[in-house]
Regions:
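Active-site nucleotide/adenylate-binding loops and adjacent lid/helix of ATP-dependent enzymes
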Residues: 1-68, 75, 87-90, 119
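Broad gene-expression machinery/nucleic-acid interaction feature
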Residues: 26, 78-82, 137-139
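A short beta-strand motif that forms the metal-chelation/ATP-contact edge
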Residues: 28-30, 83, 144-154
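Glycine-rich phosphate/pyrophosphate-binding beta-alpha loops
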Residues: 36, 101-105, 109-112, 151-164
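Phosphate-binding site of ATP-dependent enzymes
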Residues: 49-108, 113-132, 143-147
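Active-site "cap" helix and flanking loop/linker of ATP-utilizing ligase/carboxylase catalytic domains
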Residues: 116-142, 152-206
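Peripheral (often C-terminal) accessory segments that flank ATP-dependent C-N-forming ligase machineries
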Residues: 170, 174-250
Length: 250
């Protein structure tokens, strides 16, 4: 059973999905797992505004996934709810972040995000994962009040757990060793901004180039205030790997 169908059964808002040609546009077309196919971020997501664009996008996407996901495009703010569930699917940790910028700016991975707290989002994300008897780490992606997808793995914005001083990683280690872990709501700092500086700089410049000056200038301002996602005191290996991959392998 699909995540989309289960969310509908639980009364959780989700975008409309289409099995064939959409009845209305715009729609988002994406493979079920773009990373599995080795796709770059810009190639994991496409928006069709009419039938001609849809046909062209489907022809391209079906090279990787014979039945890509076709969803109604939801506009508005994007957010993620990161959860840790124990062996009995009990809630052991939760952390919310909102997207501040992304790249490509038309729709792509987050380059800057900010921690916040939303009890309703956490409840809905947990209800969905618990219904599948899920255990472990996952990030549930929202757009406005709709759940878009579930990433049942360590996700790109995972460093926010450290930036916002969330105990999720510690709880994971304790639970894995059979220790007793108790969930406490809002057990992390809110209002913490975190960025991937190279990707975020490119995003800020792209906003400026697109005429979205306010967003672009805010991005340049965050260069001095937001926490760097991959900076670790005394260990530069992660940052060097990130720079190498960003500069030479994309």
């Amino acid at each position: 059973e699909s995540v989309h169908q289960r969310a509908l059964e639980l009364g959780i808002p989700v975008p409309r999905e289409y099995d064939g040609t959409p009845e209305s546009y715009p729609v988002v077309v994406k493979p079920h797992c773009g990373e599995k196919f080795g796709l770059k971020a810009a190639d994991r997501y496409a928006v069709a505004n009419n039938e001609a664009e849809f046909d062209a996008i489907m022809e391209k996407m079906q090279r990787y996934d014979p039945s890509p996901i076709v969803q109604q495009k939801i506009t508005g703010a994007g957010a993620g709810v990161s959860l840790l569930l124990g062996r009995e699917s009990e809630l052991l940790g939760a952390l919310c972040h909102r997207r501040v910028r992304e790249y490509p700016i038309t729709g792509g991975p987050s380059t800057c995000c900010e921690s916040f707290y939303d009890e309703k989002m956490i409840d809905e994300a947990y209800e969905l994962l618990k219904s599948f008897h899920f255990t472990g780490l996952a990030m549930v992606e929202f757009k406005e009040d709709c759940i878009l997808e579930v990433n049942p793995r360590v996700w790109g914005s995972f460093p926010m757990t450290e930036a916002a001083q969330s105990p999720i990683v510690a709880h994971y280690a304790q639970a894995a060793q059979g220790g007793q872990v108790t969930y406490t709501a809002k057990d992390y700092r809110t209002g913490v901004k975190m960025r991937f500086f190279l990707n975020d700089t490119v995003a800020a410049l792209s906003y400026l180039k697109a005429g979205r000056v306010k967003e672009g200038l805010r991005g340049l301002g965050d260069f001095f205030t937001a926490k760097e996602a991959l900076s670790a005191k005394g260990d530069g290996k992660v940052m060097r790997a990130y720079l190498k991959k960003s500069l030479f392998e994309r």
